[in-house]
Amino acid sequence: MAATMTVEEVRKAQRAEGPATVLAIGTATPANCVYQADYPDYYFKITKSDHMADLKEKFKRMCDKSQIRKRYMHLTEEILQDNPNMCAYMAPSLDARQDIVVVEVPKLGKAAAQKAIKEWGQPRSKITHLVFCTTSGVDMPGADYQLTKMLGLRPSVKRLMMYQQGCFAGGTVLRLAKDLAENNRGARVLVVCSEITAVTFRGPHESHLDSLVGQALFGDGAAAVIIGADPDESIERPLFQLVSASQTILPDSEGAIDGHLREVGLTFHLLKDVPGLISKNIERALEDAFKPLGIDDWNSVFWIAHPGGPAILDMVEAKVNLNKERMRATRHVLSEYGNMSSACVLFIMDEMRKRSAEDGHTTTGEGMDWGVLFGFGPGLTVETVVLHSVPVTA
């Protein structure tokens, strides 16, 4: 009779040897592109708010200061004309919004996932886990189920659906995928973040400028990554290693950012001191993450930071004395896509590895070995992921 394995032996056999690794990245946006310079006129016209001349001027200044050149939105003029309640500040419109996002969120996620799977180059039957994240609508079965069907993944794929997490969740999905990949030998985790602003779009109101800030910043996009440990480098090409991941709630930050799903859609509120709260606590997060590595020079690591808005990036840069180049990839994504909530950091990761190759850097992290990825969002919650780059291959 063969000897039975001990629990310890089973446990060891179940776990990977090395760290979780990003093996492919894909991104997608809706076809409809809106340019920030034209947006105030369009926004006040479509919401029938041109009579609010002073508010329109304030909104123009917000858009001018946003450092955003263009955004992509599923909501076209035709869709908004057909759904006038979505153009009001507070009118019952949840059904119309839900009808859009429960279809379009998985569809946009599929487009990003297909690109990631194509780059990965392996059969989709090798995908063992799916983590799907969105703050755009809620449904049962969820967007994870819809995407599984759309992509033809195995019925036994192990799914995790994350709804209503907000802008920090691009870090959350990486943290979860890291644990899944490292604790399940041979696992290949498809991670998808898909965000569509149809849940948050609304007309202006004089007494709620924080809502107007969101209208100036948010855009639509989806990003997908494939994560696994112990890559087979004869058929898989590592991009970044996920070395550590943590989450924390910032002190004295309750109510700084929140969102509420109501009959009128998802309402969004933020306090003016959000950039200050984040910048005040950023160094502590960096120290906690990098002390085990003996790193305390924040210009010696590459940066992927959720671009909640230009003020956050400016204040973080000032607080830790960052060179302007460190946030180059982050600011590029803000400029070209706006704030796409959870998808942003994955877009930035994609931009960084592509630009590192184009600029002749030796690693996927702009020539540096170590890097940090930050997600900021409701709570205030901060996700901190320590990354290690890999050598750039031709």
From Swiss-Prot:
The keyword Glycosyltransferase does not apply. InterPro entries: Chalcone/stilbene_synt_C, Chalcone/stilbene_synt_N, Chalcone/stilbene_synthase_AS, Polyketide_synthase_type-III, Thiolase-like. It comes from the Eukaryota. SUPFAM superfamilies: Thiolase-like. One of its GO terms (molecular function) is naringenin-chalcone synthase activity. CDD domains: CHS_like. Belongs to the thiolase-like superfamily. Chalcone/stilbene synthases family. The primary product of this enzyme is 4,2',4',6'-tetrahydroxychalcone (also termed naringenin-chalcone or chalcone) which can under specific conditions spontaneously isomerize into naringenin. This is Chalcone synthase 2. It comes from Secale cereale. The lineage of its organism: Eukaryota, Viridiplantae, Streptophyta, Embryophyta, Tracheophyta.
